[in-house]
């Protein structure tokens, strides 16, 4: 996390993935109801990224796969939003978590970070939609619960007098990783 390309190992919020079906860092999106279009703002991979990760589908191809026809470079979101504001359009957004996102919102909409509370009607609409779970989502939730239970049971089984906490945590992490799961936060030991 000491380098821009070392992204976090987890998503703090899956709203972007939920609505746009893409799990890629550095993307922004707008659902423009007035224009009846969805736009993803992002940039194609740099040559450095391609050398590091190998050949990848282009961002354009990824957008096509999820049914988004409009892709614009990241730099164009500012002018797009400024035009919306100039036309008097309401711009709804969810409350930002990360400080860099608060700075982006300030640049895009002119709203200081201390006043970025998000749109309550939009927040309520997202909550209402996210309350309904598909069969696939329920399977993943149940898997997460099962793995978490296995982690705790493993900790209880391996725990011995004189063990260090890091040894117990290592066993818990082994259970998670052997199930192809990553922790959303460090184990509290």
Q: What spans do the regions from the language model cover?
A:
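A composition/biophysics-driven feature that prefers long, compositionally simple stretches
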Residues: 1-150
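Active-site cores enriched in adjacent His and Asp/Glu residues with nearby glycine-rich loops
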Residues: 1-2, 142-189
């Amino acid at each position: 996390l000491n380098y821009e390309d070392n992204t976090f190992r987890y998503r703090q919020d899956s709203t972007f993935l939920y609505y746009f079906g893409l799990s890629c860092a550095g993307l922004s999106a707008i659902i423009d109801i007035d224009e009846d279009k969805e736009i993803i703002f992002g940039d194609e991979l740099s040559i450095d990224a391609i050398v590091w990760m190998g050949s990848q589908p282009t961002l354009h191809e990824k957008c096509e796969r999820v049914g988004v026809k409009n892709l614009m470079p990241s730099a164009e979101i500012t002018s797009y939003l400024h035009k919306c504001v100039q036309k008097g359009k309401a711009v709804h957004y969810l409350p930002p978590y990360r400080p860099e996102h608060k700075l982006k919102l300030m640049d895009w909409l002119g709203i200081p970070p201390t006043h970025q509370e998000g749109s309550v009607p939009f927040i309520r609409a997202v909550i209402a939609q996210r309350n309904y779970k598909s069969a696939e989502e329920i399977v993943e939730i149940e898997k997460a619960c099962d793995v978490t239970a296995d982690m705790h049971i493993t900790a209880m089984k391996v725990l011995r007098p004189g063990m260090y906490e890091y040894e117990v945590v290592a066993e818990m992490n082994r259970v998670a990783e052997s199930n192809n799961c990553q922790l959303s936060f460090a184990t509290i030991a």
